Amino acid sequence: MSKQNRGRLIVIEGLDRSGKSTQCQLLVDKLISQHEKAELFKFPDRTTAIGKKIDDYLKESVQLNDQVIHLLFSANRWETIQYIYEQINKGVTCILDRYAFSGIAFSAAKGLDWEWCKSPDRGLPRPDLVIFLNVDPRIAATRGQYGEERYEKIEMQEKVLKNFQRLQKEFREEGLEFITLDASSSLEDVHSQIVDLVSNVNIHETLDVL
């Protein structure tokens, strides 16, 4: 399939309560309003058997060791990826609310080895564009429903932020378009910036892999 016909793979990352999920939905709605084919994928996908186990963990209903939950997060991405490939090949732009970068950033924040955290996701498709919504963890902590899940603690989020900054540096050196936006701007302004970035992204004929 030519690069003109395949869909784009767009990832939006961010700290918890950064407005990421809202922006993902706004982007999908915008693309559809422009008569483009678009679909939203949220990770973790809490509807699968693996995703339900992750959901229990995040809500602190069960305890799992850090290596186990990291591998479950990765498996949750792998179990969906074939369908994502199929959609992209049909010309559907796939918008991902979190991806492998979150897995690395959060697990490394708990002290797991950096390269080990990256290894389970090697072979997943490399996005055409990654957008990181940057917000001060202390501001995110003031937003509604903050603290309902395991990782929503300021100290943890500060470590995750540093890891995202490291990921951006590493992957940009590998040629990945990895852009940071200030998520403290208005919802409309952030949305407008995201739409501009997505509209102008350069795509290769086929997706590379991580």
Swiss-Prot record:
Transmembrane segments: none
Pfam families assigned: Thymidylate_kin
Metabolic or biological pathway, per its Swiss-Prot or TrEMBL entry: Pyrimidine metabolism; dTTP biosynthesis
SUPFAM superfamilies xref list: P-loop containing nucleoside triphosphate hydrolases (SSF52540)
Binding residues for ATP: 14-21
The enzyme's E.C. designation: 2.7.4.9
Catalysed reactions, semicolon-separated: dTMP + ATP = dTDP + ADP
Record keywords: ATP-binding, Kinase, Nucleotide biosynthesis, Nucleotide-binding, Transferase
GO biological processes: dTDP biosynthetic process; dTTP biosynthetic process; dUDP biosynthetic process
PROSITE patterns xref list: THYMIDYLATE_KINASE (PS01331)
Family: Belongs to the thymidylate kinase family.
Biological role stated in the UniProt entry: Catalyzes the conversion of dTMP to dTDP.
Name this polypeptide is given: Thymidylate kinase
Origin organism lineage: Eukaryota, Fungi, Dikarya, Ascomycota, Taphrinomycotina
